[in-house]
Amino acid sequence: MKTTTLRRALIAAVAAISVATLTPIAKAADPYSAPAAPTNVVAYPSTYGVTVRWTASPSVKPAIEGYIVSGGVGSCPVFVPATKHTVALLPVVKGQTTVAPTVQAVNSYGFSAAAKADKTYAVSTLTKTTIRDKYVSLQFLQLSDLHGALEASSTSIGVASLAGAWAADRKANPNTLSLSSGDNIGAAPQISSAFEEIPTIESLNLMKLDASTFGNHEHDRTIDHVQKVIGASDFQWIVSNYSSLTDLKSGSKAAKSYKIFTLGGVKVGVVGANTETTKEQVFPGNLKGASGEIAISPTADGVNAAIVAAKKEGAQVIVALVHQGWTENIDGAVQGRLFDWVDQIKGANIIYGGHSHQTYNSYNPGVKPGTDVIIAETRNAGVEYTRTTTCFNTETKKVVSSATEYIGKSAVASVTPDAATAALVKKYKDQLAPKLDVTIGKVSGVFPRGGTPAVERSGETPLGNFTADAVRAKYKTDFVLVNGGGIRDSFPAKTYVPLNTALVRPATGVTTGTFDVTFGDALTIFPFGNSVATTTITGATLWKALENGVGGAYPADGRFPQISGFKFSFDSTKPIGSRVVSVTKLDGTAIAADSTKYTIATLDYIVYGGDGYVGVFSPKESAIRDLYVDVFIDAVKAATAGGKVLAVPAADGRTKKVA
């Protein structure tokens, strides 16, 4: 499904329920905008459904392509081209209990907010309206990048409430499939990572997840661990762009390139894809199994082959789970690998993204009936999930249309958490608390992490400065270079919830104050178990390392360098490999790209080529030292000894982005 430049533009999260929309990154002079919501939406019953009328949204650039009209859960959404009248007939389908009409305008920049109709109808009261048996309403519940966020927090829903919400959604529409776009595990809080991520898999089982693709973080550990995860999963692992699935099995359970599910008599084929950058994002060797190393294709050839195979087996609806994401908007155009895949994938009705931890929703009207495509991505850590309603015509054997809602924490506040899932979380939490709720010091505020773009992946950040300085102080090296992607939470950690309620923690939205920090915070921030490595490099090697750090998919990659002992500047508008402008010592003396030797501390992960640092450092000439997280903990303890409070360090200009 090839998209035009304008079609590859977007707005984040429209059709959202109780979730703030993501403001597109755009220049002040950007002439593009998403449509405003339509107005004057009225609804009234008719013989063959509920008629919905509205006043068109004001004209915008790009032009409005049409309107998505939905009746809510269990309904049959329809797409009305903007060239047609501003009226639609919503069929009432078997099993539907209410008709709650909403209308959204869509252009190639994205969706408007959903405008509600003046009336909502209980189907039981529509005695003169024909129930349209030829339509089947399907429901898809989807999340991505859960990263073991099992506990509820100020932002995360928590798996017990997710399980309760999904159970309620299934009750409202039994024709439901629950899916994940990957990164369920890895870079996770201790409640998951300390137990080899099995608590997350057990939670997903209780949530009745049906299928998941792999994300890069599913490979944070060895293939042996992946096999253990597969063995513990009651759901199907699906990936279509791996060179081999031979080693991805445990007993009778095995990963597949596709699987067909039957919902309300309709066969739904699910395919999946992981990001091809996984190899450089995980520890070298993690993709090697007994039969060899898995290669991950950067193209959709395998996915398209799986779609063809699924359709030959009878699949009537295709859902693609793609662990690729949206990154930003530039001059109205969407950026991110997800959209390269959208261009390549042929025959999918729904494409769910992931990986970049963003909220995104778009709609591609097809040229032929039944070829429209919903594209959606959801935020990480269980902050929200998507609920897509898809209408299938059993006579034409085509999808009529789809509509997606974003369900956030406030929207599920009234849902009863699932007791079994809550008990599971408590069981693991109780085992951790005595070790992890131990205070290591106090801080004067929150050391930030994340954002758009993520601070630790785009520039100098307090947590990066403090940690890099701590490493240099301990090992007395000239320089330190560590990857920003290794920082997985703020400090105190947002996703670590102490059992000890006496600890002083930041309230929602509060970033200043004196807060307790614990072992649990440290292990949540640095969950990978990396060790510090010391070695000797030349000035030329340092420049090479920095070019890699500001290359790749900057500012989305985890390779961005957090440094100590020197300064550097870069220009992100220059070609990859030529972005570093200057490198100097702290006193301003230039560091040339020559053979002058320096000592440096980094991580074993980087020494062995992780995050694109292939061939930069020599493993043979490197000494593996202490655990990275232990160095951090010791530094916090030292800085807070005698009751002192560790202040959030101000930026000192060690890293400068000139453009």
Describe every region a protein language model picked out.
Residues 126-412, 458, 463-470, 552-553, ...:
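Acidic, metal/ion-coordinating pockets
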Residues 87-113:
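Beta-strand-rich modules
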Residues 29-63, 109-127:
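Pro/Thr/Ser/Gly-rich low-complexity, intrinsically disordered linker/stalk tracts
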Residues 66-96:
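Recognizes extended acidic, P/S/T-rich segments that occur
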Residues 56-58, 71, 105, 392:
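Hydrophobic beta-strand positions in extracellular immunoglobulin-like domains
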Residues 133-139, 148-151, 163, 168-171, ...:
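Catalytic centers of hydrolytic enzymes
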Residues 64, 71, 263-264, 370, ...:
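Structural motif
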Residues 1-28:
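Secretory targeting and sorting signals
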